[in-house]
Structure formats: C-alpha cells, structure tokens
C-alpha cells in the first residue's frame, strides 16, 4: 500500500512540475529539440467530429493515452490533465488531447460523458477514438510508445506537441 502512495505522490509532483514547465516554456518551444513530427492520422472525437494531425497546427498540445474504465493510473493522469485544462481554459493557443486505448469500450458516447463529468465544456480538450489497430499504430509508430497488451499495458507519459505538429518532450 505504501508503494502505491509513493507512486501517486511521485505522479502528482511530476505533473505539478510539468504544469509549471508548460506555463513557463510553452510559448518558447524553440528551446526544446524536435523529436519527430506527428504522422498523419484521423480519429473521431467525443462529439463525432474528425480530429487529425492537422489539428495540432497553431496550438501547443498536451496529449496522453487513457481509457475510461482504468482503475490504475488513468484517473490520476486525467485529474492532472484536468488541472492543466483549468489553468489554460480559454487559451486558444493551448489544447489537450486524450486518446483512448480501449475503443471497444470507450464509445463516442462514453467519451462525451467522461468529458462532461470532468467539466470539459469546450473544444479545448478532445477525447479521441479509432479502431484499436489504428490506435496501436499511432501510439507505437507515431509517438514511439509501448503499444502491446492494450488497454492495460499503456504508457503513462504525457506528450508535448508544438504548434506545428512536432513532438517536443515526453513527461
């Protein structure tokens, strides 16, 4: 039990540091080296609208992979993202994206309900879904993250994407 508390504490501190860094550095992303460009993709958001890699243009993006029935790190990841969302709410140059790794369970309706339950009331935070093979491909080949054994084996990293669609940092 103590190990679990330490993991949660570490995650909270990490996300706090990450939030501070985003606030101070998001607009000056030229200091952070480009890791790679986000490849082309087209998924569907919680409102049934298409969302593609082109939606990363002109906005700094924080992206993560979650699933709504997760009882492990996802609720904490979502809570931390919610805090960032609250800090940047209404800032047109910043957006948040959560991609489900369990699209069979996380239907469009379920993602919409999740967004409403955590207080998302605009298009600044997108919850995306596609078929599992496409999610795995994007996760593994596009974001260079572990994509086997989904949904339970998903990465807990958040990804910083600059306003031209380049991956800049993993947290």
Description of each model-found segment:
Residues 38-39, 61, 155-157:
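Short loop/turn microsegments at loop-to-beta-strand junctions
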Residues 1-40:
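N-terminal targeting signals for export/organelle localization
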Residues 93-106, 123-135:
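Thiol-based oxidoreductase modules, predominantly thioredoxin-like and allied folds used
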Residues 87-93, 119-121:
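Short helix-capping segments at alpha-helix termini
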């Amino acid at each position: 039990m103590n190990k679990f508390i330490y993991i949660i504490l570490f995650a909270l501190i990490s996300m706090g540091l990450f939030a501070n860094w985003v606030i101070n550095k998001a607009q000056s992303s030229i200091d952070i080296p480009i890791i790679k460009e986000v490849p082309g993709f087209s998924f569907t958001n919680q409102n049934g609208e298409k969302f593609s890699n082109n939606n990363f243009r002109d906005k700094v993006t924080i992206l993560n992979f979650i699933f709504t029935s997760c009882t492990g790190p996802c609720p904490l990841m979502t809570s931390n993202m919610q805090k960032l969302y609250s800090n940047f709410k209404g800032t047109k140059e910043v957006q948040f994206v959560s991609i489900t790794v369990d699209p069979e369970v996380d239907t469009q309706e379920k993602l919409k309900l999740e967004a409403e339950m955590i207080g998302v009331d605009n298009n600044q935070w997108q919850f995306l879904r596609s078929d599992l093979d496409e999610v795995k491909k994007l996760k593994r080949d596009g974001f260079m993250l572990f994509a086997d054994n989904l949904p339970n084996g998903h990465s807990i990293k958040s990804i910083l994407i600059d306003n031209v669609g380049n991956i800049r940092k993993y947290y």
